[in-house]
């Protein structure tokens, strides 16, 4: 797993690649959403607002999969499969601001809605594979 994480380090750390996050609905059907992400200390982190479908699907222990396609070469990608390790409101506003810096070049997340509660979701990889 560490070898794949190293091989695709540019996608996990440097590029402004969106991740496609797959979660499971209560009936077992897949739900797929493009998301911003970061990867730190072997943990993939995404951010969402409380009440959204993907947030409801990502309780601790829930299985998830993420595909990250290289924006410079669509035939190259990394896939992370794992489980939700942690969901936290604390630190989620800071995290979404960090992601806004990465993806938009802005210090503050500009799309916050009044009363919105952010959630940071940490995904513990069980496998990391890729192509290209």
Labelled PLM ranges:
Residues 2-3, 76-132:
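Charged, gly/pro-rich active-site loop segments
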Residues 4-8, 54, 95:
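Hydrophobic alpha-helical segments typical of transmembrane helices
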Residues 49, 70-71, 125-126:
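Short secondary-structure boundary segments
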Residues 1-18:
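Extreme N-terminal tail/first-helix region
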Residues 27-29, 70-74, 113-115:
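A short beta-turn/loop motif at secondary-structure boundaries
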């Amino acid at each position: 797993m560490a070898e794949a994480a190293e091989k695709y380090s540019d996608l996990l750390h440097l590029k402004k690649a969106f991740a496609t996050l797959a979660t499971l609905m209560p009936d077992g059907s897949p739900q797929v959403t493009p998301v911003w992400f970061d990867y730190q200390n072997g943990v993939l982190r995404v951010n969402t607002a409380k009440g959204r479908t993907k947030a409801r699907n990502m309780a601790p222990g829930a299985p998830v999969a993420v595909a990250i396609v290289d924006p410079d070469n669509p035939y190259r990608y990394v896939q992370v499969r794992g489980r939700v390790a942690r969901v936290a409101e604390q630190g989620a506003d800071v995290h979404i601001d960090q992601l806004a810096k990465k993806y938009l070049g802005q210090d503050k997340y500009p799309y916050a809605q009044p009363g919105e509660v952010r959630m940071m979701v940490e995904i513990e990889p069980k496998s990391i594979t890729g192509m290209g």
